[in-house]
């Protein structure tokens, strides 16, 4: 678990290093320097711009279409991540039994703990690091989407539905928070490991309310184009979670 956490932290640091060297207010163009701009940001910006051109400069619709396209592209990785998480949840009771069995901190006991833990993983076909690959792939893409939307000048000059894409909106942040809450609530409904772990249950319940509020508040201060991206992504995730969890919820 620590190794997995370390990988995620390293990825966040790498993504921050790649994207942090670029001013978020600097427009993205074909001539923008750096690997981050060339490989990640500009291709997304180019795609949004060209899709908008198909729909008579409809940048709002283009953001929705590109967001759904990216989410569909990454859906197999999301499914893999969720299945890996469910597999880990199912073996949690046995894993806790092993941990209670070897409470001593001496080297010999810790070696036995590690050995039995690995045997449990192998017996149940669980790879504790399997959930890292989807995160490794997805995070740079999502950050690139953020940069592309914020740094494509044409987006801010257009409107969509009732809002100006370049200015903050007051309805989209509420929708963003609402669908973030729904998505997390659906994920929690099939998390069986929480019942045997009160501490984890408390943490998840806190995050259930804190995360939507944080994202909703952030959306109030960003251009509506970014909030539209978040709302679209969150709605997709709600339907994806329902689709993946449907067999599991039916069993209950």
UniProtKB/Swiss-Prot annotation:
Signal peptide boundaries: 1-20
Entry's Gene Ontology BP terms: protein insertion into membrane; protein transport
InterPro entries for this protein: YidC/ALB3/OXA1/COX18, YidC/Oxa/ALB_C, YidC/YidC1/YidC2_Firmicutes, YidC_ALB_C
Membrane topology label: Multi-pass membrane protein
One GO CC term on file: plasma membrane
Lipid-linked residues (N-palmitoyl cysteine): 21
GO molecular function, one term: membrane insertase activity
Key words of the record: Cell membrane, Chaperone, Lipoprotein, Membrane, Palmitate, Protein transport, Signal, Transmembrane, Transmembrane helix, Transport
Annotated lipid attachment (S-diacylglycerol cysteine): 21
Membrane-crossing segments per the record: 59-79, 129-149, 160-180, 206-226, 228-248
Compartments it resides in: Cell membrane
Highest taxon above the source species: Bacteria
PROSITE patterns tied to this protein: PROKAR_LIPOPROTEIN (PS51257)
CDD domains: 5TM_YidC_Alb3
Homology family: Belongs to the OXA1/ALB3/YidC family. Type 2 subfamily.
Its job: Required for the insertion and/or proper folding and/or complex formation of integral membrane proteins into the membrane. Involved in integration of membrane proteins that insert both dependently and independently of the Sec translocase complex, as well as at least some lipoproteins.
Protein name (record): Membrane protein insertase YidC
Native organism: Oceanobacillus iheyensis (strain DSM 14371 / CIP 107618 / JCM 11309 / KCTC 3954 / HTE831)
């Amino acid at each position: 678990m620590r190794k997995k956490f370390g990988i995620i932290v390293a990825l966040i640091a790498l993504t921050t290093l790649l994207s942090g060297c670029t001013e978020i207010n600097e427009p993205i163009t074909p001539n923008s320097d750096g690997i981050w701009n060339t490989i990640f940001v500009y291709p997304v910006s180019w795609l949004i711009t060209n899709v908008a051109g198909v729909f008579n400069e409809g940048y709002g619709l283009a953001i929705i279409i590109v967001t759904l396209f990216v989410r569909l592209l990454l859906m197999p990785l999301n499914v893999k991540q969720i299945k890996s998480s469910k597999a880990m949840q199912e073996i949690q009771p046995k894993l806790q039994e092993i941990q209670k069995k070897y409470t001593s901190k001496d080297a010999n006991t810790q070696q036995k703990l590690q050995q039995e833990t690995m045997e449990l993983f192998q017996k149940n076909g669980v790879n504790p690091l399997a959930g890292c690959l989807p995160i490794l792939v997805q995070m740079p893409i999502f950050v690139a989407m953020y940069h592309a939307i914020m740094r494509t000048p044409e987006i801010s000059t257009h409107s969509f539905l009732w809002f100006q894409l370049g200015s903050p909106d007051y309805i989209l942040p509420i929708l963003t928070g609402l669908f973030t809450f729904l998505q997390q609530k659906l994920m929690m409904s099939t998390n069986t490991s929480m019942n045997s772990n009160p501490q984890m249950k408390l943490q998840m319940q806190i995050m259930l309310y804190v995360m939507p509020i944080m994202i909703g508040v952030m959306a109030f201060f960003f251009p509506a184009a970014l909030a539209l991206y978040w709302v679209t992504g969150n709605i997709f995730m709600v339907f994806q979670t329902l689709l993946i969890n449907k067999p599991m919820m039916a069993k209950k």
